[in-house]
Amino acid sequence: MDADAILKKDQRRSSLKQRNLLLSMRLNQTTATNGAPPQARVQPGKGYRNPGKVLSPIRNQEMSPGKRPTLEISELKNVSPINQAHKTGKARAGGVPLSKLQNLKLADFEIGKVLGKGKFGRVYCVRHIESGFVCALKAMEKKDIIQYNIEKQFRREVEIQSSLRHPNLTQLYGYFHDEKRVYLLMEYLVNGELYKHLKGRSHFNDVVASYYVYQMADALDYMHERNILHRDIKPENIIIGFNNTIKLTDFGWSVITPKGSKRKTLCGTVDYLSPELIRSREYNEKVDVWALGVLTYELLVGSPPFEEESKELTYKRILKRNLIFPDHVDTEARHLISRLLEYDPGDRIPLKEVKKHPWIEKNKPFW
């Protein structure tokens, strides 16, 4: 049975069987994350973060008639933590030896519900039939990877994510492929996107928000020490696990930047762009620090600080650094946000200082 038939067959399961499957998945799972690609979110009448407001260097290229898509998966060498763990014999996932996950194919998995849909594929909750190991499986069409000219970006995403080991970064276990698709195996988190939780309560209190900001600062500090920029921080790309642990996901725009060098590519989400990105100037890891400031504001207020009806108006507010705080925002939280959102990248607060900021310290005992 080919991959298409397997996916279609599993998606025709009854809702009762789906619920039973997902229940058993939760009982078997000890650590989790979903890695689902972010969904564009829309506010009535505002077109909030609609696809038109998401920037990326992707170009929609037409393929030559009769040209057969070929994706050199073999170029992804030594990037699978599964293979590395198998060699050392030390790593395990959810109590299951990772050697169980060698030489995989789609038929080795039970396919659960769709966790997310993106431009280049879908993410499913799956269970490895033999071991019972539960994870998220991202299925991407090879023809789409080639058509949209993202082979380099795809390889970079896999190589970067597979090299990261941090409690607040989603882990990529490995990948496999067949004739039509590439499949990425990632952690599964049962609690879903941070944005969905934020939307359900309008904003978080200081205790919860400070804990999330601390974790993100630690994760970004870890990445920056390894010369890696994320470049797409936002609530849709953060997943919640057990005990309010959060994990940054979606490394599609991440890039390795040697110490002292800068980037020029414009990418990210409009509301989270820093002034230097908007002005098309060279930038470094401080764009992530700015984005953390926007995230902190959004966690406490419920919307980004510079949000406007159009991209152009949002740009103007960002460049003017027109920062307005509602009355309920704590004074020390305002100070931290202002330090993160300094116009000059060199003036932005270092991430190590973020973790020791008075707003963080006074809320830490209540985590």
Curated annotation (Swiss-Prot):
Residue ranges occupied by any Protein kinase domain in the UniProt entry: 109-360
Subcellular locations according to the entry: Nucleus; Cytoplasm, Cytoskeleton, Spindle; Chromosome, Centromere, Kinetochore
Catalytic activities: L-seryl-[protein] + ATP = O-phospho-L-seryl-[protein] + ADP + H(+); L-threonyl-[protein] + ATP = O-phospho-L-threonyl-[protein] + ADP + H(+)
Span list, region Disordered: 30-49
Enzyme class: transferase
Signal peptide stretch: none
Catalytic residues in the record: D232 (proton acceptor)
Keyword field contains Calcium: no
GO CC annotations, alphabetized: chromosome passenger complex; cytoplasm; kinetochore; nucleus; spindle microtubule; spindle midzone; spindle pole
Top-rank lineage group of the source organism: Eukaryota
Keyword Cell cycle on entry: yes
Gene Ontology biological process terms from the UniProt entry: chromosome segregation; mitotic spindle organization; regulation of cytokinesis
Any GO molecular function: protein serine/threonine kinase activity
Entry EC number(s): 2.7.11.1
Family: Belongs to the protein kinase superfamily. Ser/Thr protein kinase family. Aurora subfamily.
Task of the protein: Component of the chromosomal passenger complex (CPC), a complex that acts as a key regulator of chromosome segregation and cytokinesis. Has a role in error-correction of aberrent kinetochore-microtubule attachments to ensure that sister kinetochores become bioriented and connect to opposite poles by promoting spindle assembly checkpoint signaling.
Protein name: Aurora kinase
Organism: Eremothecium gossypii (strain ATCC 10895 / CBS 109.51 / FGSC 9923 / NRRL Y-1056) (Yeast)
Lineage: Eukaryota, Fungi, Dikarya, Ascomycota, Saccharomycotina
Name of the encoding gene: IPL1
